[in-house]
Amino acid sequence: MKKTHITEQKFADLDLLPQVIEGLEKKGFDYCTPIQALALPVLLTGQDIAGQAQTGTGKTLAFLTATFNHLLKTPEHEGRKPNQPRAIIMAPTRELAIQIYNDADSLVASTGIKAALAYGGESYDKQLGKIEEGADILIGTTGRIIDFYKQKVFNLNHIQAVVLDEADRMFDLGFIKDIRFLFRRMPEPKDRLNMLFSATLSYRVQELAFEHMHNPEHVVVEPERKTGHRIQEELFYPSNEHKMALLQTLIEEEWPDRAIIFANTKHKCESVWGHLAADGHRVGLLTGDVPQKKREKILEQFTKGDVDLLVATDVAARGLHIPQVTHVFNFDLPDDCEDYVHRIGRTGRAGESGHSISFACEDYAINLPPIEEYIEHAIPMSDYDASALLEDLPAPMRLRTRNPQQRRSNNNGPRNGNRKPNQNRRPRQPRHNKEA
């Protein structure tokens, strides 16, 4: 996956403290993305912002940088105890909260500012212990934050910075009452730095900003199109008979460093997982019934590179923020047009390039016209040579026959023990536009 140039704005040229710049440089960040270049100069003057930017544009680093810098430059309130947060970052999902927390690690190390996590589905006592050790920044989901607040673990009297990430999804998931509950127990908006980020600045999001922020400046980074311009899109029309063989052949040809394969149902995901696992791939499975701890383990394996392929449903994959995903395969075209954009947006993030491959099969080709109407362009189409598809495919594994400790991932041994990359197979035939 190659890195593309982003903007000419260097972090080192902004009014950032040396400790913050050190933390950014440790992560390899030298130049700003467009949302960072627009938002940070505003935030560093102490001005609130309501930012519109798509997932994968670098907004997380923008608000983390501003939050750490603000806390370093602003004296903490007199009488504050170490477990009383100075900043709160609210996310719609626990996966996003965990990702934000992990993204903050280099800034935590370089500044000495402590961060803690609070989200449901994980040990209450473990999170409580971390907060009591000291939590300058509390990152989490609104429900668990409110639980701790009501248990008087901390109060919100010393909040000096607030981040609301993916505000539009907060509305979609019904969390807006929780957000207002927390805002109303913090100091006045003028006495804190407020940051709101959303994929769309709809009327209801702007109303929320007006109600709980202090004259926020709107910062908008419009995508050139709904699907990222760094994502190479490709479409095949496989028969149902060829669909699995085409997927496995393309994986052998592309040999992706890290790929997510989407299917529309839990049953289909399990079937795809079974074929890939039987063929020796290091593959994980995420469906709606995977327990939270197992889910986190699979995501950790995928992020570290112990698992190369992840098969997932849309519901299970919501909130995933995994860096350096090189490929996305739409084994099934989604029923919801927006899900297509969300799926392929897992790759080509924050200046990286990516590749999206979609199958318009006999069952789901009907979903293609509304998707192309929604994204406002036709997906480039490729033909395939059926005679070049893999034929020596083993019978799929079945979940119920596997050891319980291995039920959801197949990551033993070297990568793809049964196969090696083979770019000579060339199942593709010359590409052409559908209009031709």
Swiss-Prot record:
Entries under PROSITE patterns matching the protein: DEAD_ATP_HELICASE, HELICASE_ATP_BIND_1, HELICASE_CTER, Q_MOTIF
Basic residues bias spans: 422-436
Boundaries of every Helicase ATP-binding domain copy: 40-219
EC numbers: 3.6.4.13
Xref: InterPro entries: DEAD/DEAH_box_helicase_dom (IPR011545), DEAD_box_RNA_helicase (IPR050079), Helicase_ATP-bd (IPR014001), Helicase_C-like (IPR001650), P-loop_NTPase (IPR027417), RNA-helicase_DEAD-box_CS (IPR000629), RNA_helicase_ATP-dep_RhlB (IPR023554), RNA_helicase_DEAD_Q_motif (IPR014014)
UniProt binding sites for ATP: A53, Q54, T55, G56, T57, G58, K59, T60
Domain of life: Bacteria
Subcellular location: Cytoplasm
Enzyme class: hydrolase
Keyword tags: ATP-binding, Cytoplasm, Helicase, Hydrolase, Nucleotide-binding, RNA-binding
Residue numbers spanned by region Disordered: 398-436
Start and end residues of each Helicase C-terminal domain: 245-390
Motif (DEAD box): 165-168
A GO term for molecular function: ATP hydrolysis activity
Short motif (Q motif): ranges: 9-37
One GO biological process term: RNA catabolic process
HAMAP family in the cross-refs: DEAD_helicase_RhlB
Family: Belongs to the DEAD box helicase family. RhlB subfamily.
Function: DEAD-box RNA helicase involved in RNA degradation. Has RNA-dependent ATPase activity and unwinds double-stranded RNA.
Protein known as: ATP-dependent RNA helicase RhlB
Organism: Vibrio atlanticus (strain LGP32)
Originating gene: rhlB
